[in-house]
């Protein structure tokens, strides 16, 4: 189901509630094959979790290490190993989610975008070792770097100040998405180097 933010500390003026929100609509539905529930609001039968061997501990948060994907990895295994099971979104199961102060810092947001791209590549896509895929990934990374630099420059000089009243909004919503591409490419290249 959905989750909505709450705060124990003063949030920065630029930080919008929607940055800490997940909502897939007001109608209950079975998720499409390429959609996944967020781990922030995920329920699973214990017996099914045990049958699948639990969560993949190679991905996700570990101690102080930032990571994502353990819930996505689990949902992918449910679909592969138990195809008759349904993954269901129920909007009435709402969670209030504490947004910790560090998650409202711009540097943390940048790192989170990179890591989410890296881990999405790790969990959802086959991290291929074929040379052509590595080359294409590197080309996407170069483009993402150029977009990142362009976004920083344009953000300061020419951003839509109505839509992005603070430079942080522009960076978070427009520029930092390119960090996901860089994270994905990083995972592909490092995976290739290891194999």
Predicted features and spans:
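An anion-binding catalytic pocket shared by soluble metabolic enzymes
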Residues: 37-38, 113
């Amino acid at each position: 189901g959905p989750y909505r933010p709450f705060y124990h500390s003063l949030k920065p003026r630029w930080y919008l509630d929607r940055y800490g929100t997940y909502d897939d609509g007001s109608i209950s539905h079975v998720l499409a094959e390429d959609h996944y529930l967020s781990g922030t609001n995920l329920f699973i039968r214990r017996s099914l979790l045990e049958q699948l061997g639990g969560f993949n501990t190679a991905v996700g948060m570990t101690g102080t290490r930032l990571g994502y994907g353990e819930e996505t990895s689990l949902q992918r295994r449910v679909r592969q190993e138990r195809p008759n099971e349904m993954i269901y979104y129920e909007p009435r199961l709402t969670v209030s989610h504490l947004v910790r102060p560090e998650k409202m810092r711009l540097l943390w947001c940048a790192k989170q975008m990179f890591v989410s791209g890296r881990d999405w590549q790790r969990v959802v896509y086959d991290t291929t070792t074929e040379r052509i895929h590595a080359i294409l990934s590197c080309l996407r990374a170069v483009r993402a770097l150029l977009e990142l630099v362009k976004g920083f420059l344009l953000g300061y000089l020419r951003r839509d100040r109505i839509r992005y009243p603070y430079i942080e909004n522009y960076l978070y919503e427009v520029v930092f998405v390119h960090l996901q591409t860089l994270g994905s490419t990083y995972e592909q290249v490092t995976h290739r180097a290891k194999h």
